[in-house]
Swiss-Prot record:
MF annotations from Gene Ontology: ATP binding; magnesium ion binding; UDP-N-acetylmuramoylalanyl-D-glutamate-2,6-diaminopimelate ligase activity
One of the record's GO cellular component terms: cytoplasm
Modified residues (N6-carboxylysine): K222
Protein name per UniProt: UDP-N-acetylmuramoyl-L-alanyl-D-glutamate--2,6-diaminopimelate ligase
Gene encoding the protein: murE
Entry keyword Cell wall biogenesis/degradation: yes
InterPro entries: Mur-like_cat_sf, Mur_ligase_C, Mur_ligase_C_dom_sf, Mur_ligase_cen, Mur_ligase_N, MurE/MurF_N, UDP-N-AcMur-Glu-dNH2Pim_ligase
Motif (Meso-diaminopimelate recognition motif): 412-415
Function: Catalyzes the addition of meso-diaminopimelic acid to the nucleotide precursor UDP-N-acetylmuramoyl-L-alanyl-D-glutamate (UMAG) in the biosynthesis of bacterial cell-wall peptidoglycan.
Organism expressing this protein natively: Coxiella burnetii (strain RSA 493 / Nine Mile phase I)
């Protein structure tokens, strides 16, 4: 049977309200309705889906679920029209039923935090795959299996697309999924209906305040991952204030592992700590103490923040019953993630690094990491996204001025905002803005930075990372920082 009967998608409260019909697919966009589909109608940020119920019925929708609050449909039809309270928050559960609860048949590892989500998800998938456990990923780089990811519009897809992705990967033999869980997705309840097994918290720093309003609301959104029904295990950064709060709040409900790159042991939980860190010519040697054993691993990855990410990954691998010695070996073999401290061409000088750093904290960590390896000048190319948190712009300027020797400001994704307004917001954070170059054309800025760099210099191109487009006004144009840097070399 292709599809599900309506009764299979409803809970006991709604089942008595209608006759049964076969549902072939779920849609929240009336333009995509095909005969036999279920139309799910609720008020969104831009439009109210309930205004399009008649259009969905004209396209032969088999049934309609609609948000009941402040709405009474005046439509005469034999098609089942079923009211729901808080429908937007229940779409995930409905979609999970439609796809036979795929997350229940796989180990779902949810990762939240301002920075580190993508790296941790990709590293976990690499390591589990290497150990013979077929592992999919869902996140900023797309969903699917490493090497063949499908693009998504959000870090965490909308509920129907999310459950469909789970179902596709289950069909292709996935036994585990490493999944980035954004604060937006948690706040909007996109992950309702997902059975998480392990929740990972990386760290919290300023971002998305245009959406959340303040840091406390942002923190509470991140915490929601640890409140998901059925969750049994958490992995938490003990070096972070919110991490400490999560441990205090949830240590009695969940089995928690705390990790620390600063050697901090929290006696309230099992601890994975870096007891000694030794910089190498490229990367680090790290001694670790864990509940599963003690040992040393080396990594070629740039940045002490990546040590923190690797401790989270080590914790997850051991919780997934990978033997400790094998887990350590996997850490040493992990490959860098596209757009995350990515070396453009390791065979040529100057060294050029592309990184997704688009918050003050991430930019500071990237620059600090590169300073440790820099024998000449550290040159930083960055901008800030338009239509996003304006408050972080001067903060990023202050960070760049403190840690870089030369700064070139440029466009990131200005979107509908004036590029000059964005630059002015950034410049407000500089003590000496006259020392800062401005080149709005990002390709020109990258070319200028590379050509001005001497052999021992390092150029950091920050903000866009893996992205392959640039959004200027209403145009989405092809653009790739790595490719532009290669042209400039």
């Amino acid at each position: 049977m292709n599809g599900k009967y309506l009764s299979q998608l409803l809970d006991a409260k709604n089942k008595a309200l209608t006759a049964d019909v076969l549902i072939k697919a779920l849609q929240t966009d009336s333009r995509k309705i095909q005969p036999g589909d279920l139309f799910i109608a609720y008020p969104g940020l831009q439009v109210d889906g309930r205004d399009y119920i008649k259009e969905a019925l004209d396209k032969k929708a088999a049934a309609v679920f609609y948000e009941a609050n402040q709405y009474n449909p005046s439509i005469q039809t034999k098609v089942p029209l079923i009211p729901f309270e808080n429908l937007q928050h229940r779409i995930g559960e409905i979609a999970a039923r439609f796809y036979d609860d795929p997350s229940c048949e796989m180990e779902i590892i949810g990762i939240t935090g301002t920075n580190g989500k993508t790296s941790c998800a990709q590293f976990i998938a690499q390591a589990l795959q290497s150990q013979g456990i077929r592992c999919g990923v869902i996140g900023t780089l797309g969903y699917g299996f490493l090497g063949s990811l499908h693009k998504t519009s959000h870090t965490t897809p909308e509920p129907i697309q999310l459950q469909q992705a789970f179902a596709e990967m289950r069909k292709q033999g996935a036994k585990a999924i490493a999944m980035e869980v954004s604060s937006h997705a948690l706040h909007q309840r996109r992950v309702e209906g997902v059975q998480f097994d392990i929740a990972v918290f990386t760290q919290l720093s300023r971002d998305h305040l245009d959406y959340h309003g303040d840091m406390e609301n942002y923190a509470r959104a991140k915490e929601l991952l640890f409140q998901q029904p059925g969750l049994h295990t958490g992995v938490v950064n003990c070096d972070d204030a919110l991490g400490k709060r999560i441990i205090a709040h949830y240590r009695h409900q969940l089995t928690l592992v705390g990790y620390s790159a600063n050697g901090v042991k929290d006696d309230r939980v099992s601890s994975v700590i870096a007891s000694a860190i030794q910089p190498l010519a490229q990367g680090f040697s790290v001694e670790v103490q864990t509940p599963w054993g003690e040992g040393t691993f080396t990594t070629p990855l740039f940045g002490r923040f990546n040590i923190s990410n690797l401790l989270a990954v080590l914790s997850v691998l051991c919780l997934c019953e990978i033997p400790f010695d094998k887990a350590l070996l996997e850490l040493s073999q992990l490959r860098n993630v596209p757009g995350r401290m990515q070396v453009v061409d390791s065979q040529r000088q100057p060294q050029i690094i592309v990184d997704y750093a688009h918050t003050p904290d991430a930019l500071e960590k990237a620059l600090t990491a590169l300073r440790e390896h820099c024998q000449g000048r550290l040159i930083c190319v960055f901008g800030c996204g338009g239509d996003r948190d304006r408050g972080k712009r001067p903060q990023m300027a202050a960070v760049a001025e403190q840690h870089a020797d030369q700064i070139i400001l440029t466009n990131d994704n200005p979107r509908t905002e004036s590029p000059l307004t964005i630059i002015q917001d950034i410049q407000a954070g500089f003590k000496n803005k006259n020392a800062v170059l401005v080149k709005l054309d990002r390709a020109e800025a990258i070319r200028y930075a590379v050509q001005m760099a001497a052999v021992n210099d390092i150029v950091l191109i920050a903000g866009k990372g893996h992205e392959t487009t640039q959004t200027i006004a209403d145009q989405v144009l092809p653009f790739n920082d790595v490719e532009e840097a290669k042209k400039a070399l």
